[in-house]
Amino acid sequence: LLITKRKVPPLVATLVMLFLVQGAQQAFTRGVPSGFVPETLGIVNQSWGFLSIPLMVWFALNAVFLVLLRMTPFGRRVYAVGSNADAARLSGLSVHRIKIAVYILASCLAVISGVILTGYVGYVDRFIATGLDLDSVAAAVVGGTAFYGGKGGLLGTIAGVLIIQILSTMVVLLGLDAQTQFIIKGLVILAAVSLYGLAQKQA
C-alpha cells in the first residue's frame, strides 16, 4: 500500500520495512541467537538422490511461476503493468491490485526462503540472511531485469542466480574473505547496470 497508494519508491519502502523488521527482531531476541526450530523443519537438510530439498523447492517454484507468468492472464497483466503502468491503466487493468498481488507473492516467497534458511541453520539470528539481499538484487540485474523496472523475465533471473552462485562458490574456493565477496558482487551489479544503460543509449 505504501508503494501503490502513497507512491513511495519501491526501494525506499523495502529499506523501511527492512529496518522495521530488523529493529523488531533485535528487540525480541536482544541481539542473541535464540529460539528453537521444530524438528519438522529438519527436512530441509535432507535430500533425494543428488537433489536437496531446498533445490527441489526452488525447481518447483520456478516451474510454477514460469507457467503463471507465461501462460495465464495474470502473468500477461503483470508484464503489461511492468512495461507501462499508464498504458495498462488506460486499457482497463487494475494496476493497484496487480501490484499488490505481485508484492504479496514476493512476500510469500520471502517467507518460504526464511523458513528454509531457519531450518537449515537451526536457530534464529538477525544476521542469518546478511548479504542475501545483495545476492537477490545482483541475480535479478545480471539476469537482465532493469534496475528501475519495466524489463526482465524469470528465465533471465534463473540464469542470474546460477551466475551469482557460481561466482560465490569461486570466491570461497579462492579463500577470499566476506568483505571481498561483497566488493566483487557490488562490482558485478555496477557492471550489469552500466551495460544495460549503454545498451539503452545505443537502442
Regions found by a protein language model. Name each.
Residues 6-74, 98-101, 120-129, 180:
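Transmembrane helix-bundle core of multi-pass membrane transporters
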Residues 18-25, 57-68, 103-114, 140-145, ...:
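Hydrophobic core segments of alpha-helical transmembrane domains in multi-pass membrane transport
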Residues 63, 90, 94-97, 167-203:
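Cytosolic-side transmembrane-helix boundaries in multi-pass membrane proteins
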Residues 74-99:
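Short cytoplasmic-facing helical segments at TM-TM junctions of multi-pass membrane proteins
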